[in-house]
Amino acid sequence: MAPGFTISFVNKTIIVTGGNRGIGLAFTRAVAAAGANVAVIYRSAKDAVEVTEKVGKEFGVKTKAYQCDVSNTDIVTKTIQQIDADLGAISGLIANAGVSVVKPATELTHEDFKFVYDVNVFGVFNTCRAVAKLWLQKQQKGSIVVTSSMSSQIINQSSLNGSLTQVFYNSSKAACSNLVKGLAAEWASAGIRVNALSPGYVNTDQTAHMDKKIRDHQASNIPLNRFAQPEEMTGQAILLLSDHATYMTGGEYFIDGGQLIW
């Protein structure tokens, strides 16, 4: 950072959905390192509470994990209200929860569609809406960062001229990116900013299970010639949540190693 450029979230509460693993955990650690109290929303991971508590102890902030199905409106609303009561006024949200199904399009089912879209689109909307409603009731400003993906713009390859068969994931991320624009437009007058952060290929447990040939092919087509580390996603998220980004809303910011240059 340039001299004098600092970001502090001391005495602020930030929610991270899917904040117990992968990119989400990197977000959780980053906002905690900046002084925020952090609420981690998770679906079913057995170690989520332990992971969240460990972050709190490491950075000396309040942290708490909340089990919640982001596609369930009533549960999301109650969870957001509980976070506000437990950790103090919510100042930011990173809507990061996401899932994928990798299958040829001819084999995909309605259940697959619901599984992906319930989390990646409706779950994002559900969480953003619950937080925004709370802010509107309190006449409070806030910032939302939605984790979309560079896959909102492309069809990922598995090999030269070969498609990675995840059409529901890619289309859900395109929907997610456009959802951000709509929410940003509706809530701007209330001082609520909404932006999308769109990662490229990142080293996570999920990508680690991919075929090495696919990973190598994908990395070879990135101008920076490698997958990112989860921590490399955090700088843009921290900026968007901060007071240094008060004139930024409705944008989609790609952290993709230059992939979309091509």
Swiss-Prot record:
One of its GO terms (biological process) is mannitol metabolic process. It is an enzyme of class 1 (oxidoreductase). It catalyses: D-mannitol + NADP(+) = D-fructose + NADPH + H(+). The active site is at 149 (proton donor), 169 (proton acceptor), 173 (lowers pka of active site tyr). The keyword DNA repair does not apply. It comes from the Eukaryota. Keywords: NADP, Oxidoreductase. Its EC number is 1.1.1.138. InterPro entries: NAD(P)-bd_dom_sf, SDR_fam. NADP(+) binds at residues 23, 69, 96, 129, 169, 173, 202, 204, 206. One of its GO terms (molecular function) is mannitol 2-dehydrogenase (NADP+) activity. PANTHER family: BENZIL REDUCTASE, NADP-DEPENDENT MANNITOL DEHYDROGENASE. Belongs to the short-chain dehydrogenases/reductases (SDR) family. Homotetramer. This is NADP-dependent mannitol dehydrogenase. The gene is mtdH.
